[in-house]
Amino acid sequence: MSVLTVNLGENSYDILIDGGTLPSLGRHCLERGLSGRVAVISNPAVAELYAEQVRASLVESGNQVTLILIPEGEEHKNAATLNLVYDQLIQAGLDRNSYIVALGGGVVGDLAGFAAATFLRGIPFVQVPTTLLAQVDSSVGGKTAIDHPRGKNLIGAFYQPRLVLIDVETLTTLPQREFRAGLAEVIKYGVAMDLAFYELLERDSGRILEMDADCLERIVLRCCELKARVVEQDEKESGLRAILNYGHTLGHAIETLAGYGTLVHGEAVAIGMVLAARISLAGGYCSEGDVSRIVALLGRFGLPCIPPRIDQGRLAETLLTDKKSRSGIIRFICNRGIGDCVVVNLTAEQLLTLSGLEV
């Protein structure tokens, strides 16, 4: 088992990474002072596969377990679903000595984390991510949120988990589309932060697509190491942490306007990375060769590189609701070659023009 500690003072926590770790969840929670009433929040598809293992482990450690199921899909990561979760937390009798376990992908983790951050002004929660995207990105760092009709993740809080337990064996049950979408976040780390890691992804793309267990565990660990390093220096995204949004500014806007469910999150991020690379090229931060390498690797992993048809006026308007927008200026992440990045201040119109998406 790989153990990685995210050092955030009193908010520090461990990330445990291994295959077949789900049955040990209850013990690891107990070791961290978590016991009593616990709500496991999941969706029907994930619960069918893993809820019984998780429930049995938690019961064995002396917990009273309530399973709360939420609908699958980004379109349900909203206030209506959150209120249904609150209703069930109250009905189950959870109090400030209780905790929440988020069992699932990014939607479950984001919503369950925000429920934990706000229920009774905050109760502990544990992340048990079962998708590649959640394992390498959304489960680590304490970003919790729900969506608003005007944009993605506009209502949320920074709220760190007590523990992240990653069982890489859960990746074997992922639909191929979800697995490939998670690879967009993996590629993001290489482009924005680590050239050697990017080269490993190019070199081992075949093994990755074959879902080689050792290869996947190394990839998940490296992504978590890179994210933890940034979060430790900038927990609440006041500066450095913005680099983790590479590909996300345009990606989020495209995902919102295409309609949740049209593109899964990782597919939108892949398109956002291609557009970010074009903007970086136009700004002189990278070469044509760098852009070609990024497009090639995304294509090798079966990810889209061309945005759907979207009204550019609405796209510009949506960009201005982005959390990184200040007085009409967007803090945009450009890649500097491959393996490094830089923050550039641009207007929405400049972003669309430089990316080739004319207003």
Swiss-Prot record:
Catalytic activity field: 7-phospho-2-dehydro-3-deoxy-D-arabino-heptonate = 3-dehydroquinate + phosphate
Q: Which UniProt keywords apply?
A: Amino-acid biosynthesis, Aromatic amino acid biosynthesis, Cobalt, Cytoplasm, Lyase, Metal-binding, NAD, Nucleotide-binding, Zinc
Pathway(s) the chain acts in: Metabolic intermediate biosynthesis; chorismate biosynthesis; chorismate from D-erythrose 4-phosphate and phosphoenolpyruvate: step 2/7
At which positions is NAD(+) bound?
Answer: 72-77, 106-110, 130-131, 143, 152, 170-173
Q: Does the keyword Nucleus apply?
A: no
Cysteines joined through disulfide linkages: none
Q: What molecular function terms (GO) are annotated for this protein?
A: 3-dehydroquinate synthase activity; metal ion binding; nucleotide binding
Q: Does the keyword Lyase apply?
A: yes
- Cofactor binding summary note: Binds 1 divalent metal cation per subunit. Can use either Co(2+) or Zn(2+).
Note the HAMAP family from the entry: DHQ_synthase (MF_00110)
State the protein's purpose: Catalyzes the conversion of 3-deoxy-D-arabino-heptulosonate 7-phosphate (DAHP) to dehydroquinate (DHQ).
What family does this belong to?
Answer: Belongs to the sugar phosphate cyclases superfamily. Dehydroquinate synthase family.
Question: Which named protein is this?
Answer: 3-dehydroquinate synthase
What is the species of this protein?
Pelobacter propionicus (strain DSM 2379 / NBRC 103807 / OttBd1)
Specify the taxonomic lineage: Bacteria, Pseudomonadati, Thermodesulfobacteriota, Desulfuromonadia, Desulfuromonadales
